[in-house]
């Protein structure tokens, strides 16, 4: 598969990037090589390969779900301007 000079110029316009003649030639070559590699990958026979979600059979070890901090509600509410029944009171912003 190849990409034409016109395709590169069209994509450059759509992407709003400026490319000059030398860059278009280099991009044409580089993108052609990339598309050739994609064609090679597409041609590989993967019928006997079992699909997988991750290449490693490792399971992430999670920490236990336990409380690690003490309850400091009273200390925080002691320095708050206004509280009531354990809740913070704030000024009304919607009438």
Swiss-Prot record:
Keywords annotated in UniProt: ATP-binding, Ligase, Nucleotide-binding, Protein biosynthesis
GO molecular function: asparaginyl-tRNA synthase (glutamine-hydrolyzing) activity; ATP binding; glutaminyl-tRNA synthase (glutamine-hydrolyzing) activity
Pfam families listed in its UniProt record: GatC
Top-rank taxon, per record: Bacteria
Catalysis: reaction(s): L-glutamyl-tRNA(Gln) + L-glutamine + ATP + H2O = L-glutaminyl-tRNA(Gln) + L-glutamate + ADP + phosphate + H(+); L-aspartyl-tRNA(Asn) + L-glutamine + ATP + H2O = L-asparaginyl-tRNA(Asn) + L-glutamate + ADP + phosphate + 2 H(+)
Gene Ontology biological process terms from the UniProt entry: glutaminyl-tRNAGln biosynthesis via transamidation; regulation of translational fidelity; translation
Annotated EC: 6.3.5.-
Annotated PANTHER family: GLUTAMYL-TRNA(GLN) AMIDOTRANSFERASE SUBUNIT C, MITOCHONDRIAL
Subunit field text: Heterotrimer of A, B and C subunits.
Family: Belongs to the GatC family.
Function as written in the Swiss-Prot or TrEMBL entry: Allows the formation of correctly charged Asn-tRNA(Asn) or Gln-tRNA(Gln) through the transamidation of misacylated Asp-tRNA(Asn) or Glu-tRNA(Gln) in organisms which lack either or both of asparaginyl-tRNA or glutaminyl-tRNA synthetases. The reaction takes place in the presence of glutamine and ATP through an activated phospho-Asp-tRNA(Asn) or phospho-Glu-tRNA(Gln).
Protein name (database record): Aspartyl/glutamyl-tRNA(Asn/Gln) amidotransferase subunit C
Provenance organism: Marinobacter nauticus (strain ATCC 700491 / DSM 11845 / VT8)
GN (gene name): gatC
């Amino acid at each position: 598969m190849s990409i034409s000079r016109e395709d590169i110029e069209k994509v450059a316009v759509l992407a709003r990037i400026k490319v000059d003649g030398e860059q278009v030639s280099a991009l044409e070559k580089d993108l052609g090589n990339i598309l050739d590699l994609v064609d090679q990958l597409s041609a590989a026979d993967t019928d006997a390969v079992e699909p997988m979600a991750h290449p490693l059979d490792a399971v992430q070890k999670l920490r236990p779900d336990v409380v690690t901090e003490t309850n400091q509600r009273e200390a925080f509410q002691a320095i708050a301007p206004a509280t009531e029944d354990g809740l913070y009171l704030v000024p009304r912003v919607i009438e």
